[in-house]
């Protein structure tokens, strides 16, 4: 009866195979290696995807820059065109005044000698009034000068003269009228400035 346990142990030892353990460990190592390779492929795919996203973002940035540059060029062209032709309304109105001036001259040349001078004066006076109205329409007005205190911001002194009735520093005579548009001087009035009566 004592021999049976030994036989059972021997039988169990015979059933244990170390090669099977080695084979199992080999399969585990192979699985780990395969998993690592799969992980490397996943990282490569991720890098490829990220590179694609970066390239796409770069394309969008370049496209946005190109659109912005085109907008700036178009805006610059439009601004230049507006500045270039900003005076068109004024020119149109002045051309109408020129037409009326030519009509006044033609009427004076076809009239008799006596009527010619009077008609010319009247016609030119009317044209001048029309021209002043056109200038006023475009916010262009004559700078007050004669009898005013000399102001270098609006007046240009071309000479001085004594005057018994006009105080020193006052404008005694206007040689060429000055004009301003809104609050900006287009050209200063050229004036003669009084030095007073000279008694001092």
From Swiss-Prot:
GO terms classed as biological process: protein folding
Compartment annotation: Cytoplasm
Acidic residues bias (residue ranges): 1-17, 34-44
Any one GO molecular function term: unfolded protein binding
Superkingdom, taxonomy of origin: Bacteria
Main location as per UniProt: cytoplasm
Keyword Transport attached: no
SUPFAM superfamilies: Coiled-coil domain of nucleotide exchange factor GrpE (SSF58014), Head domain of nucleotide exchange factor GrpE (SSF51064)
A single cellular component GO annotation: cytoplasm
Protein keywords: Chaperone, Cytoplasm, Stress response
Region described as Disordered: spans on this chain: 1-49
Entry-linked PANTHER family: GRPE PROTEIN (PTHR21237), GRPE PROTEIN HOMOLOG, MITOCHONDRIAL (PTHR21237:SF23)
Entry function: Participates actively in the response to hyperosmotic and heat shock by preventing the aggregation of stress-denatured proteins, in association with DnaK and GrpE. It is the nucleotide exchange factor for DnaK and may function as a thermosensor. Unfolded proteins bind initially to DnaJ; upon interaction with the DnaJ-bound protein, DnaK hydrolyzes its bound ATP, resulting in the formation of a stable complex. GrpE releases ADP from DnaK; ATP binding to DnaK triggers the release of the substrate protein, thus completing the reaction cycle.
Protein family: Belongs to the GrpE family.
Subunit description: Homodimer.
HAMAP family per record: GrpE (MF_01151)
Listed name of the protein: Protein GrpE
Provenance organism: Rhodopirellula baltica (strain DSM 10527 / NCIMB 13988 / SH1)
